[in-house]
Amino acid sequence: MERTTLCYIEKDGKVLMLYRNKKDVDINKGKWIGVGGHVEVGETNDECLLREVKEETGLDLIEYKKCGKIIFYIDNIIEECYLYRGFNFTGELITCSEGELKWIPKEDILKLNLWEGDYLFLNRMYENDNYFEIELKYIFFRNPF
């Protein structure tokens, strides 16, 4: 099972979102997502969070909260994703190799082109302060020829 982290960093009523548009082959291409990535061998979820935020944004996250766990079933892949909110950081945004970083007003997040399941867990994360777990299943039909 793959383990990942996903973080939504907040500042002045806005959330830092990543528009995935730089790689030709990218399951997230054309979608807005939070920042994060795969947990490396020997790394804790929190260590992964801090490393991925730094690599993708240039920011050093100081204050954060683990909000939930999402189990993604994507075809034959199972991904265990730990969801975070970031509240305080130092540093300046850098150019991200994954896509375009942009501060989006919190009330506009659900108007973006997100994965279907993201609408569910983002609503839950922002409406309730309690830790939660959710399972999301995606099935992609591919042409066998």
Each language-model region and where it sits:
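Nudix hydrolase/Nudix homology domain
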Residues: 96-145
